[in-house]
Structure formats: C-alpha cells, structure tokens
Amino acid sequence: MDKLKEFWQESKADYESKHNTPFLTDYDKSLPYFEKMQELLLDMQKEDKNNVDVACLLASVRMELRDSYDTCAKLLLDFLNENKNCLSDNDKARIYTNIGYYIGFDSSTPEYLLKAENLSSPYAETYKGLGLYYFSEYERDNGDKNLKIAIKYFEKAKTISKDYVNHFNYAASLYENKKYQEAKIIFENLLAKYPHRMRLILALSYCEIFLGNKEKAAFYLSQVKCGQDENYSLSTDEISEYQVYDSYYVLDEYDTFLDNCKDIICNYYTDDWEHYYYTLWIKNKKDEFYTLVNSTVSKLEESIKEAEIDEEYDSPDEKEEYIKSYKEDLVKYRAMIKDIEDGCKKPEITLNLYPEYECFLIDCLRHKFMD
C-alpha cells in the first residue's frame, strides 16, 4: 500500500502542477494517471495474485476508467472464486461489500451486502450500504418495515465509524420514524461539531415543528440559507427553497409562506400544489388564485389539443393513452380547485429528511488516498 500511496501523491502533485486545478477534476486529463495506476496494480498482482488490496483497488481503477459496474463486480467475483480457500472472513466481507456497491440497488435484495453481514463484517460501509438500500425501499413503498430495518443498519454503521455521515443518516431515519426527540439530540450534537451547517439547522427546525415548539422551529428556520452550503459540500448540504418554505406552511405562517413562494413559484410544477392554492384561498388572495387557476387550465387544455393533433406516436394506442392521461390530469386539477373553493380542511404535507446517499465502496480510490 505504501507504494500505491507514493504513486498517488506523485500523480496528484504532477497533475496539479501541470493543470493548475485540483486532482482528478477533469476526466480526460485524469485518464493517463488511472491508466498508469492500472499498470502498476496489474504488475503487483502478477507478483502476488492473492493480494486483496490489489484486487479491490484494481476494480476501483476500472470503475474510474469507466468500465461497467458489472465488469468491476465480475473482477471481484472471479478473484473471490479463485482464492476463497485462502481468504479470511473479513477479506470476503470486504469483497462482498465492494461487489454490493457495484451491483447497486437494482436487485430485489442486497445479496452481497447481506453476505458480508453474515460474515460479521467489521466495515461500516457494509451497514451503511444496507441502511441506504432499505431506506430507498422505504422511500419507494413508504413502509415502516423497511424504515426500521434501515434504522438498525445505520445505527450499526455509526457504532463502527463515528463520522458525520453515519450519525446524520441514523438521525434522519429516526426523524422519518417520528422519533423526533432522539433525532433532535443527535442533530444538536452534530451542530456543535459542525457549526452553521444549514442541513443540520433545517433538520432541527423540522424536529421542533413536530415536537410542538413553534418558536424554536421559527428561530432555526430564520437561519437557513437555501442553495449549496458555503462551508460544506455533501449532496444533503444543498437545500431547496421549498424545503424551507413548506415549513412555514406547516407552522401556519401563511404570509411568510406566500411571500417566500412568490419569487420561486415559476420554477416549479405547481399543478398539484394543493397547499399553495389552499393558502391563497384562505388568505383571500383571490386574484392570484384565479390567475394561476386559469393559466393552469389553459395549459392543460392546450396539452390535450396538442396530443390530439400530434402524429409523433409509435401507435394509436400510445396516442390515446397520452390523451387520456392529460384529460385525467385536468379532471383531477378541477376537482382539487373545487374542494378548496368549497372550504376543504388544510391539506397535509410532509417534511422529509433523507440520508446522504454517498459512496460506500470500501476501496474507493478517491476516498482511500485523498482523505
């Protein structure tokens, strides 16, 4: 590994000197370095064909060279089959976890991650991957069963590796399971270590909302800045406007909700924003309400007309399906507007938190050598 680290540091220095940009920010410029590393790893593998480090890193290099993920997984499966009698359970768990990353979440079960777990994997990445798999299943079917399984794995991951992401993922899944007080404590502890982190402040505002602490929730919301956090760079560190503005709706802060939405409403698909129409109605913003209604009805009717005259369909049946779908959208929209005009109760919306869907590849080149 020392030889590889030395090569990586030399490559990094050479790249940044030549291109005056951070290492690996441009694929075409990075390609020669990945190719050289592949050559180095292949030479090392000839000397020691049973070396797990080399096999796992070789798969990672192939991924960087844009081989298919299936190819990367097959490399490791072949290595495992050829060397299974001389590999420890930890080695096998490591390989299975890496394969689980390459295979992804397309299969009905996370087969290889579960194999790693069955070998008592000591790697946090195994349990992070399992947590992400079951949380994604929860997002798909909104089922408590998958959420509770995800919580179990996120908790295991954070006991092994006490980094930010594992704690955040665990807290986010607790929040989704309505364990607001437990989630709040974790978010508070994280905020003490990562001050002014916008995602944590927003998460705390969500917790306070559902704990009934309206003033605390509003205090946190007032600090949140939308967009990418200036100081942190994970995907969850980017906050969309609606994630903040919808919070004011839940808090019954309707004027603030409408004021905030005014500047961004044109950026979103609003046909199903029942809560927005409801707020316009109860705040007696009838002109804005009917202006939006009339423009939306016109748009939906125009979609139907265009579909009826459009001949760019694969078959008459496909054309009829599109026309039917547009007509159903118009019927649903008009029904929603009538419900609001008739004085429907306040539409409920959800304020969701999501885990950080980051890399859980144990032998990721970028994380292994750049951290």
Listing of model-derived features with the role each one plays in the protein:
Residues 53, 90-94, 125, 163-166, ...:
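Start-of-helix register in tetratricopeptide repeats
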